[in-house]
Regions:
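Secondary-structure junction motif
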Residues: 190-211, 278-286, 296-300
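Beta-alpha-beta core module
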Residues: 154-159, 163-164, 225-274
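Flexible hinge/capping segments at coil-to-helix
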Residues: 87, 155, 159-191
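Alpha-helical linker/hinge and terminal dimerization helices associated
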Residues: 42-43, 64-86
Length: 300
């Protein structure tokens, strides 16, 4: 039994594509195809099929998927336990992050973690959809999700930071006359909003719904920076996490921000599916982030 083939199978299923799986794992597409053909030959029946949604599992593949995921996870843990017995901490942690977190936070976290655990590889996967990150965490495609907490979470949660939202605007905007912005002041304004693959920012949408503000985005983009470029030209205003603006002031010198009243904020943290049984490398990553934040080594 070649565990590597099962790891490749999971990547193909999670990505829905041979090409994307090859890119993720560092293989050629032909190499991925060969391994999957070989695995299906060993099994004696097809595991994958093509559909209008990409590559998906056959009924036989779906039946075996839970056991395959468990097998791969147990193998990963066994390899890391071997390393610990030998006095080494090694392995790989795959982290799913919002793009804003990748830009604003992860470089410093990676530096701190690499200095402490040089044998543990960190693999970052960017995704702007809360729903997709949740699915990846549940399926085991990622080990840790680094995003904002939602009421429906069923995972072990480790808070890192309270991150407030601010209204961002050109310095030429009339709204700069106000020290704080009320939600109803944004109604009727050309409004630019960040949009994930499953819709507009869930935290922003929840805030406006709670405060009964009627907001219709004029422009949406899957790139925070695209939104900022539009606002820089005084084409409208937006609402983005303050975490992003702290690292954008030099790049966008003609924009400014204002807080909201009532405040809008989100809790940023790490989500792990069953922390107590997670592999040692995952536990070390969570512990390092929490300790670095609490002792001031990592200031976010």
């Amino acid at each position: 039994m070649d565990i590597k083939k099962y790891e490749v199978l999971l990547a193909v299923v999670d990505k829905g594509s041979f090409i994307k799986a090859a890119s993720e794992l560092g293989y050629t597409q032909s190499g991925i195809t060969y391994m999957m053909n070989s695995l299906e030959k060993e099994c004696g029946f097809p595991l994958l099929q093509r559909s209008n949604k990409g590559v998906i599992l056959t009924l036989e593949g779906e039946r075996l998927l839970p056991e395959i995921r468990q097998l791969v996870q147990l193998n990963k843990r066994l390899e890391q336990d071997f390393s610990e017995v030998k006095g080494q901490i090694a392995g790989k942690v795959r982290i799913g992050c919002f793009p804003t977190i990748v830009c604003a936070v992860m470089p410093r976290i990676m530096r701190i973690f690499r200095d402490k655990y040089p044998q543990i590889q960190l693999d970052l996967v960017e995704e702007n959809s809360v729903g997709v990150l949740e699915e990846w965490l549940e399926s085991g495609f990622i080990d840790v999700a680094f995003f904002s907490r939602q009421p429906r979470y069923e995972y072990d949660w480790f808070p890192v930071k309270e991150d407030r939202y601010v209204v961002v605007m050109s310095k030429e905007s009339p709204l700069t006359a106000y020290d704080v912005i009320k939600p109803n002041q944004l109604e009727g304004q050309p409004f630019f909003m960040y949009r994930g693959s499953d819709g507009i920012d869930a935290d922003v949408a929840s805030y406006f719904k709670k405060n009964k503000a009627d907001l219709m985005p004029t422009f949406t983009s899957s790139s925070d920076y695209a939104v900022l470029y539009m606002i820089e030209e005084n084409l409208g205003i937006g609402m983005i996490p303050e975490l992003l603006t702290l690292h954008s002031e030099e790049k966008f010198p003609t924009i400014t921000t204002r807080p909201l009243d009532p405040p809008a904020q989100r809790e940023i943290g790490l989500a792990v599916n069953h922390y107590d049984t997670a592999v040692p490398a995952v536990q070390r990553f969570v512990q390092t982030v929490q300790k670095s934040v609490s002792n001031g080594t990592l200031i976010i």
